[in-house]
Amino acid sequence: TICHTGYRSEDYSDRSFITRMKALGCPDIIFIFGATNDYWAKSPLGEYKYADWSKKDLYSFRPAMAYMLDTMIDYYPNVEIYFLLNDGLGNEITESVRTICKHYQIDCIELKGLDKMSGHPSVKGMKQISEQVKAYMAVHGK
């Protein structure tokens, strides 16, 4: 999960994206493929919040995602950051990702029609992700 709330409302603060985001080494480019487990775990959405986050805020998706992007932009200067948005997520979380990415001017690559097994991309689905990311990058001159 991006936020600290996981499955069965358990505390995932030891393994959430926002806990691990500073452990990526020295990348040239970052693709964040998140929000799926937040959606599946029914993590609370929370309110849009773009500053002054409390620890409690980070247990809800919207403020945690904003905190993550805000922190990563500062922590990884001169690194291209992209968000990969899975298909098949609910409208509220999909719109939340779009809104927060737009706020931070982060490209949101919306994946479509992925082949999946038990909700996870199959080998074919992983190839589709690769193809869609390559196509997005080509169209946007990246």
Q: Model-predicted segments: where are they?
A:
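Conserved SGNH/GDSL esterase-like catalytic core that processes O-acyl groups on lipids
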Residues: 1-55, 120
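Active-site-proximal beta-strand/loop segments in catalytic clefts of secreted hydrolases
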Residues: 2-6, 33-37, 84-88, 110-114, ...
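Extracytoplasmic/secreted proteins, especially bacterial periplasmic and envelope-associated proteins
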Residues: 16, 53-67, 71, 92, ...
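Loop/turn elements at helix/coil->beta-strand transitions in domains of secreted/extracellular proteins
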Residues: 25-30, 76-81, 104-107
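Active-site segments of SGNH/GDSL-like serine hydrolases
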Residues: 33-37, 64-98
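Sec/Tat-exported extracytoplasmic proteins
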Residues: 34, 69-76, 104-105, 133, ...
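Von Willebrand factor A/integrin I-like adhesion domains
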Residues: 97-110, 115
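Histidine-centered active-site loop/cap adjacent to the catalytic His
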Residues: 117-142
